[in-house]
């Protein structure tokens, strides 16, 4: 501000310097001299002119000079006022800068702003007055319910019962006994884990159901029970035999014999088998321990021969395997007609339930070098293979497909035995087919 002020002062100095001389120049005579000197020829022509004209000129010039002096006298005061205003503004700016310096950093301000925003949103989400009243009422009801809790005597009774229960728990078997029980449970769990797969259990359950139905058709219930007891005792006696392989063979024959007994229609045949079992039991009781196994085996062989004279497992031209009968056709039909052909003989287009059954059927078809239909297709949903009985194809059976199959080449939706595995083929192609049904007793004609 000092630099800008000095030029104005210097300009004023030009106007104010040598006031004495300036005052001298303001005398009338000076003006008169100048006027006379400036208009020498005119004055001479006019004869010195009137005095009034000179006074008027002097007055006008004096007014102009006074006005200039007044304006010049105002300049220092305006400059001083401007300087004070600038100082005030500078001080205010300094104070504002200091105040700004004391504010929190930008990140802190943003954080505060965010918190305020969140708080505002939370306040907006507070339940309305009616909701608060509802909560208050629920709290009031809860308080009243607490007041209705059982009295002290009732609580003491509950505590005593808990104490007695704790004491009873303390009387449980000792740790060694618990460990023994735990081991037994572990063994039981392991045994359960070794049970056959679900499909096998279903097959066993179906066989038991069929056996139960056949037993229900026997003529005399008391005779059936007696026969069953005899078989149970015989099974126990067989369990004492030394050789496992021979035991398994005898047990299988007994199982087949039991099934056959359930299927015998005539009372005379049942009595005949019962008599043979009675004789077998009597012979078993009289045999010495060393020859008991051979004698039982011989009796069972004779009994099996007698039974086979009475009936056979499967109809003519059917093949028996593991409780089922299989028919391999000698003519060809498409898949749908093959399903119908099996139904006409009270059978089903073959549904495979086990690896043993698959190996048996694959061997039969490969020996005859025939492409044969099985009861498997994905007609209901592409890529989802299903047996004709409604059961899905087990993931463990996927390995039986030939390499690259099934490929659905040309809309192939039906499965066939092909070579050493399975193949998908068009359902309208003519193939041989295989029917399957449970084995029963068929009498010779």
From Swiss-Prot:
Disulfide bonds join 311-441, 314-325, 342-435, 414-427. Residues 71-445 are extracellular. Glycans are attached at residues 92, 407. InterPro entries: C-type_lectin-like (IPR001304), C-type_lectin-like/link_sf (IPR016186), C-type_lectin/snaclec_domain (IPR050111), C-type_lectin_CS (IPR018378), CD209-like_CTLD (IPR033989), CTDL_fold (IPR016187). Residues 1-49 are cytoplasmic. Ca(2+) binds at residues 405, 407, 409, 412, 423-424. GO terms for molecular function: calcium-dependent protein binding; D-mannose binding; metal ion binding; pattern recognition receptor activity; virus receptor activity. GO terms for cellular component: external side of plasma membrane. The keyword Nucleotide-binding does not apply. GO terms for biological process: adaptive immune response; endocytosis; immune response; innate immune response; receptor-mediated virion attachment to host cell. Keywords: Adaptive immunity, Calcium, Disulfide bond, Endocytosis, Glycoprotein, Immunity, Innate immunity, Lectin, Mannose-binding, Membrane, Metal-binding, Receptor, Repeat, Signal-anchor, Transmembrane, Transmembrane helix. It is a single-pass type II membrane protein. The keyword Nucleus does not apply. Residues 108-315 are annotated as: 9 X approximate tandem repeats. Its main location: membrane. Sequence repeats lie at residues 108-130, 131-151, 154-176, 177-199, 200-222, 223-245, 246-268, 269-291, 292-314. Residues 320-436 form the C-type lectin domain. The chain crosses the membrane at residues 50-70. It is found in: Membrane. A motif (Endocytosis signal) lies at residues 14-15. CDD domains: CLECT_DC-SIGN_like. SMART domains: CLECT. The tandem repeat domain, also called neck domain, mediates oligomerization. Probable pathogen-recognition receptor involved in peripheral immune surveillance in liver. May mediate the endocytosis of pathogens which are subsequently degraded in lysosomal compartments. Probably recognizes in a calcium-dependent manner high mannose N-linked oligosaccharides in a variety of pathogen antigens. Is a receptor for ICAM3, probably by binding to mannose-like carbohydrates. Homotetramer. This is C-type lectin domain family 4 member M. It comes from Pan troglodytes (Chimpanzee). The lineage of its organism: Eukaryota, Metazoa, Chordata, Craniata, Vertebrata. The gene is CLEC4M.
